């Protein structure tokens, strides 16, 4: 049958499109993992252990805001233009990070880098949702998700090796050639996809209130990690400010002609449940990405390189499970059981990680983190596909961006909360005359104990996910077909 999805699926140019999307995604995804193993050395060089989580937080905050904003702007100005812009911003931010002379500069420059990273994380999944039928999306979502696994494998290794050899600054400079390659591939392969019928109206009120609401909230969370360093009244003030901006944001979205985040989406139970599950699942995987290397170096005494190597099995398992989940969805058209399996497996992983102590062997740490990765990979395909299937093609852009948004929110909220748990645990443990290694061990144990609660909540919620069979065919944007066909000639 010569239907629309078959025309797209057989287009030879799709090979180059997927390659370009994967490299673009790689340049952002690599940065999430490469900095983890380098952070102890960065802190040692620039000073400021109290700022340990801030480079993560600033990056995640700016990328979280960028996902929604530029996901919507790509409806107006085209996916290709926004993708290229994202790479340029990311590369510039990387260069600035590499030249940082203190932690404050690094935190600020990571924020710039995060804007580009947010664009590059969201747009590839939107494009795949547009050019493939629901049944085929599983395979290609799995392929894109594997980029996170590959980058996560390469990231810790590169982060450790680069840090131990030429220095931590080069973990940022390495993004420059990758970014240039990504621009070249996307310029020559990706058509300028635009959503027809969208009014060229920018929701400035929504953008401003959205940015201020998130910034106030996340800044308050971050400052709350150390109540001794920051006045409580300032922290409370930030949360109040955030709440006011959030109310104004809701009001602005109700009035907007083209809202950046349409509120009616939340009336769909699949969208709401998938958003919550993305939030929880991302918090779980980030607990491993951040604190497994710290445990390996600080408790087990491993080098930056070896702490990166011990992360490889976890991230390979993430890649494998993402692809397997995508294949299962493509063949069966079902995804609910996979959502349940996601939290059963990740729950087992964090329970085991919570048992770690100074006597834990590197092989045990490797096994525990691998289980966490095996469950986490399922997230990248299941919840994006469930939401794309619950809405029309016209809404794929914003709904897909929203799923990436809630993943980033999960990480951005979890990172400072984990930091608060660590700081509180370290200060409490210091009062009972424990050694530094014992204090660090107990602090990391407490973090993983907290993630057990998140895994249990995710498991319960997964049972309420509505499952709708995926179709083999779907009406695909005629403009997309035309552009792909022209490029294939």
Q: At which residue positions do the language-model features occur?
A:
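12-transmembrane solute porter fold
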Residues: 16-27, 36-37, 55-56, 231-241, ...
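Extracellular/periplasmic helix-loop-helix junction of adjacent transmembrane segments
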Residues: 38-66, 107, 305-306
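Interfacial helix-cap and linker-helix signal at transmembrane-aqueous boundaries
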Residues: 42-43, 73-74, 106, 158-166, ...
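Cytosolic juxtamembrane N-terminal segment immediately preceding the first transmembrane helix
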Residues: 1-30, 44, 75, 256
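Central cavity-lining transmembrane alpha-helices of secondary-active solute carriers
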Residues: 57-72, 121-125, 312-325
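Helix-loop-helix hairpins in multi-pass membrane proteins, especially solute transporters
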Residues: 70-205, 393, 415
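C-terminal membrane-cytosol helix-exit motif in multi-pass small-molecule transporters
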Residues: 176-195, 211-223, 241-256, 458-466
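Intrinsic disorder in cytosolic terminal tails and internal cytosolic loops
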Residues: 1-13, 465-489
């Amino acid at each position: 049958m010569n239907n629309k999805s078959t025309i797209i699926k057989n287009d030879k140019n799709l090979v180059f499109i997927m390659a370009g999307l994967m490299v673009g995604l790689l340049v952002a995804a690599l940065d999430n993992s490469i900095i983890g193993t380098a952070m102890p050395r960065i802190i040692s060089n620039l000073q400021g252990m109290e700022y340990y989580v801030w480079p993560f937080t600033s990056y995640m905050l700016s990328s979280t805001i960028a996902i929604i904003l530029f996901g919507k702007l790509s409806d107006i100005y085209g996916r290709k233009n926004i993708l290229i812009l994202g790479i340029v911003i990311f590369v510039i931010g990387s260069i600035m990070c590499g030249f940082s002379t203190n932690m404050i500069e690094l935190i600020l420059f990571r924020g710039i880098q995060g804007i580009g990273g947010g664009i590059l994380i969201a747009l590839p999944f939107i494009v795949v949702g547009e050019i493939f039928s629901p049944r085929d999306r599983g395979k290609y979502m799995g392929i894109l998700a594997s980029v996170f696994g590959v980058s996560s494998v390469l990231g810790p290794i590169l982060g450790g090796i680069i840090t131990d050899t030429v220095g931590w600054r080069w973990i940022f400079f390495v993004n420059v050639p990758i970014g240039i390659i990504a621009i070249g591939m996307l310029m020559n392969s990706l058509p300028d996809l635009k959503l027809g019928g969208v009014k060229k109206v920018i929701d400035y009120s929504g953008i401003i209130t959205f940015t201020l609401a998130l910034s106030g909230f996340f800044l308050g969370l971050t400052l709350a990690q150390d109540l001794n360093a920051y006045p409580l009244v300032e922290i409370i003030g930030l949360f109040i400010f955030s709440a006011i901006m959030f109310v104004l944001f809701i009001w602005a979205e109700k009035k907007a002609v083209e809202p950046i985040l349409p509120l009616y989406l939340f009336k769909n139970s699949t969208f709401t449940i998938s958003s919550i599950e993305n939030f929880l699942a991302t918090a779980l995987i980030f607990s491993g990405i951040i604190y497994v290397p710290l445990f390996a170096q600080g408790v087990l005494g491993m080098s930056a390189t070896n702490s990166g190597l011990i992360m490889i099995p976890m991230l390979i398992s993430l890649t494998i499970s993402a692809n397997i989940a995508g294949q299962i969805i493509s063949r069966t058209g079902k995804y609910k059981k996979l959502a349940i399996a996601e939290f059963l497996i990740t729950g087992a992983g964090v329970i085991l990680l919570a048992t770690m102590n100074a006597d834990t062997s590197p092989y045990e740490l490797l096994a525990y983190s691998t289980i966490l990765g095996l469950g986490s990979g399922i997230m990248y395909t299941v919840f994006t596909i469930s939401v794309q299937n619950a809405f029309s093609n016209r809404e794929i852009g914003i709904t897909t961006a929203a799923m990436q948004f809630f993943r980033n929110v999960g990480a951005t909220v979890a990172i400072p909360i984990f930091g608060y748990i660590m700081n509180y645990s370290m200060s409490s443990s210091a009062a009972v005359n424990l050694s530094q290694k014992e204090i660090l061990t107990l602090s990391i144990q407490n973090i993983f104990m907290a993630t057990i609660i998140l895994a249990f909540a995710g498991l319960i919620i997964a049972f309420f996910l509505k499952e709708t069979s995926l179709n083999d065919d779907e009406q695909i944007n005629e403009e997309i077909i035309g552009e792909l066909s022209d490029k294939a000639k």
